[in-house]
């Protein structure tokens, strides 16, 4: 049973518009390399990067809390659109750059690895999307 379901409607594909059922999201989708001067909007890669970074940050806080560790972290999500040589189409790759600020590197890496196992986005992409984890 779902704990929460997000609902967003997209019209017009990569040159269209998206809206969420609650009205929070309501903006144009534009091709990253085809933006015209003054044109605003986002793209699916930015949206995926935002969602993954936020979700991973929550997972990192969760696994740290389970070990009674207070953590101050920042997650930078990078999502790249790449050519898929296997079928001539496209695929995405993800890099998550994790800055845990004052935490020692060994413990930070342990928590990042645990968060990667726990995070719903990581579970959804596992075996399907190349995901790199970088500790800053």
Curated annotation (Swiss-Prot):
Pfam families linked: OsmC (PF02566)
GO biological process, one term: response to oxidative stress
InterPro entries: KH_dom-like_a/b, OHR, OsmC/Ohr_fam, OsmC/Ohrsf
Induction of its expression: By heat shock, salt stress, oxidative stress, glucose limitation and oxygen limitation. Expression is sigma B-dependent.
Keywords: Stress response
Keyword Lipid biosynthesis (UniProt): no
Transmembrane portions of the chain: none
Family recorded in the similarity comment: Belongs to the OsmC/Ohr family.
Main function: Involved in organic hydroperoxide resistance.
Protein name stated in the entry: Organic hydroperoxide resistance protein OhrB
């Amino acid at each position: 049973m779902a704990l929460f379901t997000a609902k967003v409607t997209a019209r017009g594909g990569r040159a269209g518009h998206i809206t969420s059922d609650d009205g929070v999201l309501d903006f144009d989708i534009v091709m990253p390399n085809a933006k015209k001067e003054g044109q605003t909007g986002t793209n699916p890669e930015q949206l995926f990067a935002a969602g993954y970074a936020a979700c991973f940050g929550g997972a990192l806080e969760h696994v740290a809390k389970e070990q009674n560790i207070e953590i101050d972290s920042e997650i930078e999500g990078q999502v790249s659109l790449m050519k898929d040589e296997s079928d001539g189409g496209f695929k995405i790759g993800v890099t998550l750059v994790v800055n845990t600020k004052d935490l020692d590197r060994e413990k930070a890496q342990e928590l990042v690895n645990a968060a990667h196992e726990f995070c719903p986005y990581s579970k959804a992409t596992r075996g399907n999307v190349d995901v790199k984890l970088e500790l800053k």
